[in-house]
Amino acid sequence: MKKLARLTALLLTGALLLVLTACGAETEQQAKQRLLKEINSYRASIHLDPLKEVEQLSAAEQELIEHFRAAGKTVLPKSEADEALDDWGSATEGWSYYDDFGLELSTGESGEEIRFLSAKVPANTPEGKAELWAALKGSGKFMDEDCKHIGIAVVTIDGQMYWSCCIYN
């Protein structure tokens, strides 16, 4: 009887782990696709064509924000981040850059210039969608009818997902 109880407990534990894995957190790739879908839904709501993701541009964007992941922080000195921006510039050469979102330039507490990731991936809920649409609208960067292409990337730092993108004509 005890063996049957142990076996049942073991099977239930395994089933629970399987369910938790299947219902687990969104991956970076899933978050990226959801963000792109929401950006294009937002653009459709204001009667604009969708932005087409270009793998070359997304790869450049991913490489850029991977520097933050490698450092394990969302803020880098401008000089360090600018090295990554030089590589990004080479990778996106020939594309007509319009604007970017999620990577900011500011002055740190010590007076040095810093670059930081500012756009957290919102929860995959109605509230998260509303938060994202408010950010898209408030930025004014997704409303140009001449923009047709996007490079978009997501990284996880300290358990929080951040995203950035660049928009091109």
Each model region followed by its residue ranges:
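C-terminal motif of bacterial Sec signal peptides marking the signal peptidase cleavage site
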Residues: 19-22
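Charged, low-complexity, helix/coiled-coil-prone segments
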Residues: 6, 70-75, 131-133
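Bacterial N-terminal signal peptides that target proteins for export
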Residues: 1-11
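A well-ordered secondary-structure block
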Residues: 82-169
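Short, well-ordered surface patches within globular domains
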Residues: 26-101, 150
